[in-house]
């Protein structure tokens, strides 16, 4: 397993003038909380340099840190591509959820992909549902839209890849908690071929049925592999308050482990991004320990090969 530390906050907005979102601290905070030990001796740790954050969008776009996100994504893509091409599971620790773009850009070089997107928000903001010519925005609310080819070309077009990083019908989004709100930001996602299980549907059908829907998606086409995106705000805020936009209801740790285990142990799984944990909102480190405990008990395909997980 390659554990790729991606210390970025480029996709997030400042909370007040002069503020820098703290997600860039997450990889080191998780390492300090014992993640390397929890994953075991077979994990190799690789670290990307931290990019410089700027609260003001660059000339030519209203996407905050837009061009810096592309540059960081291209670097991350090289790391992920090397892992995937060597047959090694890539665990990418962010950082905000803009890390999904670079991870997919690297994994996609191996062939067509499916995406299992766990997130308390669908992150489907794109020029079709907001005024991109007037409103400043951050990629952290756009990652699924960009991954499916919606948005500015410098964040939807990638070297050696034709078309979007993943087509709509190769995506399942799990955990949205705002889809029943009157002011839901991206209702147009319901008119796409993206499979959705919002948190309310999940509460009705449970882990087994949700897992069956995921497996049905993975069996419905001939993608070379699949990628998992785990935005930790999909967990209930009582469990994971240390995120940009915490909320309830959400998944439990037990739910998440049960959903992830059959995926990370699958030979088709190329890797997983973990995003949006903010150590600045976790002064006693409790949330870091929760994440280390969750990630440390997963039956990654390489760990089962080494015999470290029963």
Regions found by a protein language model. Name each.
Residues 2-310:
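Conserved alpha-helical scaffold segments that buttress catalytic/binding sites
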